UniProtKB/Swiss-Prot annotation:
Positions that bind Zn(2+) 2: D104, E139, H353
Enzyme class: hydrolase
Organism the protein comes from: Shewanella pealeana (strain ATCC 700345 / ANG-SQ1)
NCBIfam families: dapE_proteo, PRK13009.1
Family (UniProt): Belongs to the peptidase M20A family. DapE subfamily.
Binding-site positions, Zn(2+) 1: H71, D104, E167
Functional pathway: Amino-acid biosynthesis; L-lysine biosynthesis via DAP pathway; LL-2,6-diaminopimelate from (S)-tetrahydrodipicolinate (succinylase route): step 3/3
Name of the coding gene: dapE
Domain of life: Bacteria
Function: Catalyzes the hydrolysis of N-succinyl-L,L-diaminopimelic acid (SDAP), forming succinate and LL-2,6-diaminopimelate (DAP), an intermediate involved in the bacterial biosynthesis of lysine and meso-diaminopimelic acid, an essential component of bacterial cell walls.
Lineage: Bacteria, Pseudomonadati, Pseudomonadota, Gammaproteobacteria, Alteromonadales
Assembly with partners or alone: Homodimer.
Annotated cofactor note: Binds 2 Zn(2+) or Co(2+) ions per subunit.
HAMAP family listed in its UniProt record: DapE
Names of the cofactor(s): Zn(2+); Co(2+)
Protein name: Succinyl-diaminopimelate desuccinylase
Length: 381
């Protein structure tokens, strides 16, 4: 066996991947991590909310608090016949570790833990505290996961100073991109009311599709803002639309539309809601609408966490990383509102949520070194 195949981070990543922890299952991943963190001097606190398993682990009692955040749950594997290897039987092929969760994000979890073990061994009297916030409900409804842990910490005034989320942020090579912010996400569920009837007698019915179409067109064409130097302009997308009985001779009685905003810091959810309602009202629609607040936008500007991350990636990989705010949401959106600086640093995201998910073994080694260097930059001054 090669040295890479025998490494601590690869061994742990394999152990984690072998556990089929599809949301909201944890399948013992956190217990495995907790055992090793306990040996490194961490106090372990399990927080179980309904069907979700969470772990808060902390070493030290002083500020500042550096927190690794991540999730043990993975998305479903999909069609097993399309996998080259069984998704929960991790295997290395040509320097790539294959398995569900390899990139998102059990590889990152392994790198976090091994980096922390090494750091604590070298610097047992480090400044501040190190913490882990791990959940089994990131890929799912995100109701009983990180948000509940944060509520618990806030209730007892336990604050995180810096948080590194291990989401796969890299695009082409490890460290080329980190996420120092994310757009907000707001979902609208709209029902436009009409009167069902026969298509041959439209004067006896009221077609909600015809009524809604101009309003939806205006919403789709609207320029919501211009973005700024950190965020692209706010985007509006219709995700689902449903109306009709399936018959060609029936005018539907209602039209259901689900749409989503990914919005910048130039607007708020309240502003977007007000503008949507004004457009719907201007078109004279009879409607019901409900809203789902998926997360606020956040941004970590220049400061200790971003500087430490840039320096670590440059030292380990030679790459000048590019901080970006593009992409979907992450659990960082629940941590940032507490006042913490938040950044996402992880492996290449080319295969996440796909069949044959994989990550370069050599990247896991580099990621471990990056995480350890970030700890040193922040807690060894």
């Amino acid at each position: 066996m090669s040295q890479l195949q025998e490494s601590a981070v690869l061994s742990l990543a394999k152990d984690l991947i072998s556990r089929p922890s599809v949301t909201p299952l944890d399948e013992g991943c956190q217990s495995l991590m907790a055992e090793r963190l306990s040996q490194a001097g961490f106090e372990i606190e399990s927080m179980v909310f309904d069907d979700t398993t969470n772990m808060w682990a902390r070493r030290g009692t002083q500020s500042p608090v550096f927190c690794f955040a991540g999730h043990t749950d993975v998305v479903p594997v999909g069609d097993l016949n399309r996998w080259h290897t069984p998704p929960f039987e991790p295997v290395v092929i040509d320097d790539y570790l294959h398995g569900r969760g390899a990139a998102d994000m059990k590889g990152s979890l392994a790198a976090m833990l091994v980096a922390t073990e090494r750091f604590v061994n070298k610097h047992p009297d480090h400044q501040g505290s190190i913490a882990f916030l791990i959940t089994s409900d990131e890929e799912g409804p995100f109701i009983n996961g990180t948000t509940r842990v944060i509520d618990t910490l806030e209730a007892r005034n336990e604050k995180i100073t810096w948080s590194l989320v291990g989401e796969p942020s890299s695009t082409h090579k490890l460290g080329d991109i980190v996420k120092n912010g994310r757009r907000g996400s707001l979902t609208g569920n709209l029902t436009v009311k009409g009167i069902q009837g026969h298509v041959a007698y439209p004067h006896l019915a009221d077609n909600p599709i015809h009524k809604a179409a101009p309003a939806l067109d205006e919403l789709a064409r609207m320029k919501w803002d211009n973005g700024n130097e950190f965020f692209p302009p706010t985007s509006f997308q219709i995700a689902n639309i449903n109306g009709g009985t399936g018959a060609s001779n029936v005018i539907p009685g209602a039209l259901e539309v689900m749409f989503n905003f990914r919005y910048s810091t130039e607007v708020t959810a309240e502003i977007l809601i007000e503008r949507v309602l004004n457009i719907l009202d201007a078109h004279g629609l009879d409607y019901d609408i409900s809203w789902v607040y998926n997360g606020l936008p956040f941004l970590t500007g220049e400061g200790p966490l971003l500087e430490a991350t840039k320096a670590a990636i440059k030292k380990v990989t030679g790459t000048d990383t590019d901080p970006q705010t593009s992409g979907g949401t992450s659990d960082g959106r629940f941590i940032a509102p507490t006042g913490a600086q938040v950044i996402e640093v992880g492996p290449v995201n080319a295969t996440i949520h796909k069949v044959n998910e994989c990550v370069k073994v050599s990247d896991l080694e580099l990621l471990t070194d990056c995480y350890e260097a970030i700890l040193e930059n922040l807690l060894c001054k």
